[in-house]
């Protein structure tokens, strides 16, 4: 049986800040279901971990990890959830904080984590066939295996797979860290290694040293090889394209199922969509909007420019003046964008609700209650929200990039095919035009709309497909 150790900086259900947390929960479970023994290693953030899981933790061992001149305590705890065994790396100095990221010493924190992962394998006698790494927090591990731990015989056959969930975050530090944190020489500090504009780039090191690299959608894998999306690593990615692929993320089809979702006022399915309207009325009442059967548009997102919130704001004013619609926005993020959304709520109190908060239950109610889901991201490695919206029969409007292009089939008025709407030209007027098209179709052609809902709801976005592609990647490396 293939053995995989899945290393990440976060994992639901313990803690998550975004899509990485969802993937770190769902993909290991899906790999297990495919017959691949998969264990997960993450940091132990005691302040974030729910008590029910804290109480299940069992100590395994402890040792010290040399971070520069400092011998740092490293405790290993374990628990099993949904048939997946998790190892948690414990060091209060580094991980006993209120948040997960964004600290001045993140370099030291995740240098420690990566060395702890490498040393833990021998300490607990779990030597995987595949080390599945995720984003910059674990991207330097292939470099460490080649330069620091090369003498450990048991590690020689380990293959490394690096998954890039978002190329924007790379782990870029002063070259001094090679010695001051990792205690390795400067042999890798070259263009073909880890050097990046007079800095050390962990993600670049991972791309160059890993046995395989993938991103979380086929389109994003192509896009990041261009200057427009490559975040200054497009040349490195083109040089490594022989080992680069795109594997689409999935969603938990059981968890996000309108037929069984306990957060909803009324459950419904692709066969019986009528109760969906009850969810709309309940949400309108809850949020203080007029209870009317009008088109409800929704955003559930981090409020950032990457997610296209600035584009949406620029498109909104004429749209709201001319159209009898309601808009519900749920999320937190850039304070300037939060303020702008609140301003719209003040200007259009009968039409706009800006819920500046993080609330998963409310999010699921919004997916169920709304008619149109807005996701005009500037770039989108994969995106999960558009898949959730479709599964709830809420048709997405997306910018045709990355995973949005791979998951949403644009409506074709001639054939009736489609699961949503998309636009290419990233302009407020273009977004506004497609919003008007969607709202008009909803109002004037209810039978066409219902057919699109049915097509969206019956798409299979389950993790099984993704897990099979990861399995194929692993098998290819192990030949």
From Swiss-Prot:
<comment type="similarity">
    <text>Belongs to the glycosyltransferase 1 family. Bacterial/plant glycogen synthase subfamily.</text>
</comment>
<keyword id="KW-0320">Glycogen biosynthesis</keyword>
<protein>
    <recommendedName>
        <fullName>Glycogen synthase</fullName>
        <ecNumber>2.4.1.21</ecNumber>
    </recommendedName>
</protein>
<comment type="function">
    <text>Synthesizes alpha-1,4-glucan chains using ADP-glucose.</text>
</comment>
<keyword id="KW-0808">Transferase</keyword>
<dbReference type="InterPro" id="IPR013534">
    <property type="entry name" value="Starch_synth_cat_dom"/>
</dbReference>
<dbReference type="GO" id="GO:0009011">
    <property type="term" value="F:alpha-1,4-glucan glucosyltransferase (ADP-glucose donor) activity"/>
</dbReference>
<dbReference type="Pfam" id="PF08323">
    <property type="entry name" value="Glyco_transf_5"/>
</dbReference>
<dbReference type="InterPro" id="IPR011835">
    <property type="entry name" value="GS/SS"/>
</dbReference>
<dbReference type="Pfam" id="PF00534">
    <property type="entry name" value="Glycos_transf_1"/>
</dbReference>
<keyword id="KW-0328">Glycosyltransferase</keyword>
<dbReference type="GO" id="GO:0005978">
    <property type="term" value="P:glycogen biosynthetic process"/>
</dbReference>
<dbReference type="GO" id="GO:0004373">
    <property type="term" value="F:alpha-1,4-glucan glucosyltransferase (UDP-glucose donor) activity"/>
</dbReference>
<comment type="pathway">
    <text>Glycan biosynthesis; glycogen biosynthesis.</text>
</comment>
<feature type="binding site">
    <location>
        <position position="16"/>
    </location>
    <ligand>
        <name>ADP-alpha-D-glucose</name>
    </ligand>
</feature>
<dbReference type="InterPro" id="IPR001296">
    <property type="entry name" value="Glyco_trans_1"/>
</dbReference>
